[in-house]
């Protein structure tokens, strides 16, 4: 297909995989005007509770939506996850030109890998995993955001600036940071061992 609009919709598989290969855009936004009988906002959801989600498309718009599976893999030019959730019971991998995760959550129970050619905007967002977290980006804006590994290492690399003003960078084991410049004003960093 070219485009897929799943606004306030549900795409799922109880025991299998979900694969979406689009030449256009994936819209998984939550339309705040869509409410259930109790008045709760219906979240657009793409889920494979016991399987894997593979999404390969031009743009992913998951504003306020949920993408969840045992393993979640996204490959796109632009990923917009503002106030959305991208997660997995095991691993999450995202490969994109840009990722906007403002007020959003990207979380893996095991390992998380985010590769962004241009900018990762994680203002007031969370990019985290229980296992190892690997982030490679052209630049990282983590103002008031959180980038961390609960039980393993955080490997954060940027070809440009990492802005961590009022942000949180943490790892249970190693915290590895490589960048052209690091703005670390008013921050919290926790680790067993830090290498900057």
Where are these regions (language model features)?
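A composition-driven surface/loop motif
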Residues: 1-196
């Amino acid at each position: 297909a070219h485009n897929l609009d799943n606004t306030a919709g549900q795409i799922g598989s109880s025991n299998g995989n979900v694969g979406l290969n689009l030449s256009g855009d994936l819209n998984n936004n939550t339309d705040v005007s869509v409410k259930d009988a109790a008045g709760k906002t219906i979240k657009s959801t793409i889920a494979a509770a016991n399987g894997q989600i593979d999404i390969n498309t031009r743009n992913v718009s998951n504003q306020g939506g949920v993408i969840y599976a045992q393993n979640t893999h996204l490959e796109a030019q632009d990923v917009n996850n503002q106030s959305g959730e991208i997660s997995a019971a095991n691993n999450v991998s995202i490969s994109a030109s840009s990722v906007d995760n403002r007020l959003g959550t990207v979380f893996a129970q095991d390992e998380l890998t985010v590769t962004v050619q241009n900018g990762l905007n994680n203002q007031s967002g969370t990019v985290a995993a229980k296992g190892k977290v690997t982030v490679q980006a052209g630049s990282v804006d983590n103002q008031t955001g959180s980038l961390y590994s609960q039980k393993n290492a955080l490997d954060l690399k940027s070809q440009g600036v990492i802005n961590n003003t009022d942000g949180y960078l943490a790892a249970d084991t190693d915290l590895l940071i490589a960048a052209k410049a690091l703005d670390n004003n008013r921050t919290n960093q926790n680790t067993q061992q830090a290498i900057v």
